[in-house]
Structure formats: C-alpha cells, structure tokens
Amino acid sequence: MSSIELLIIAVGLSMDAFAVAICKGLSMKKMSYRNAVLTGCFFGGFQALMPLLGYLLGTQFKDYITSIDHWIAFGLLSLIGINMIKESKNTCEITDEDDTFSLKSLTVMAFATSIDALAIGVTFAFLQVNIIPAVTMIGITTFTFSFLGVKIGNLFGVKFQSKAEIVGGLILIGMGCKILFDHLGVISFVFDSLNKFN
C-alpha cells in the first residue's frame, strides 16, 4: 500500500474524530487552544493505538485467510464507511464545557471514535502494511483534524459535522473497492485496455 493510499485512509478515519471534535468546540464559549490540543492528543493517540492492536491481532490469523484477505479488507472498509455515513445524521449533544473536556469524557469519546481503526489495523495485517509509519500517519492526521474540528466547531457550529462523516465514509468505501479491484485485476485490465486504444 502506497503512502498516498495510507494518507487517504488516515483522512477517512479521522473524519469521525473530526465530527466529534466539532461538537466539543461548539460547547466552548471562547476558543481554548489547550482544549483543542488535548482533544487532538487523545483522539490522535487512540486512533494510532487501535490499528496497532488490530494489526497484532490480524497477524495471528493472516496465514489462514490469505486467499480471501482482499475480500475481508473490502468488507471491513465498506462496513466502516457505511456506518460513518449512517452516523452523520446524529446531531451534537451539547454539554457543559468542563464536562466536555474532562479526562473521562475525552477518553470515552477517543475510544468510541477509534474502534473503527481497530478493524483497519486487522486489514493492514492482511495487506502486509508497514505498521509503524501507518499508525504514525493516522495519529498525526487525526490529531490535526481533531484540533481543527474544535476550532471550526467553536467558530461555525455544526455546519460541517455531518458532511465530514459522509466524506470519511465515502473515502473508506472507495479504498475498500480499490483494494478489491486491484486484487481481482480489474484496475490493471482497465488501464491495459485504455493503453491499447492509445
């Protein structure tokens, strides 16, 4: 898997955290960069840790399902993407600012938004992805989007929340399709056919 593909997956995964971060930003009367950094660290940290755990889990079964690994990757990415699109209909639940940025609240929400990343880690094991650069990229990307989410939520409210989750879902579904089509030779067949016409 190329660095560009990993970045695309990282962006797709981070949209869930981005949407929640917007809600957190909405609860602030005044922008707090401390809270934005804290949110980014929690969300980015969990989002990096969960794929690593998923990868370690996936390596235990990799040898048994090599022949269908592309179907599993396609299925997991598509299901996560569809779920993100469904969740885009949920609206922000506004709570007190102190509660919103408490360690308990941040831990619970960071864990909840990173469960999908656990499944992504399993697909990384099947696709033999270099896991350390992958989780580093996911963590940094999620930190960035979470930080921006708090800022955007504080400035504009929930305007971008649902759109972010829809975009994230579509990205993950698209990557799942690409992995499947790559393995089935559909993409190379299309390019070969186009080259013949040229």
Swiss-Prot record:
Primary localization: membrane
Superkingdom, natural source: Bacteria
Keyword field: Cell membrane, Ion transport, Manganese, Membrane, Transmembrane, Transmembrane helix, Transport
Keyword Transport in annotation: yes
Membrane topology: Multi-pass membrane protein
One Gene Ontology cellular component: plasma membrane
Cellular localisation: Cell membrane
Family matches, as InterPro entries: Mntp/YtaF, Put_MntP
Disulphide bond pairs: none
Keyword Transmembrane helix set for record: yes
One MF annotation (Gene Ontology) recorded for this entry: manganese ion transmembrane transporter activity
Positions of transmembrane segments: 3-23, 37-57, 65-85, 105-127, 131-153, 171-191
Pfam annotation, one family: Mntp
Biological function: Probably functions as a manganese efflux pump.
Family note: Belongs to the MntP (TC 9.B.29) family.
PANTHER family: MANGANESE EFFLUX PUMP MNTP-RELATED
Protein name: Putative manganese efflux pump MntP
Gene: mntP
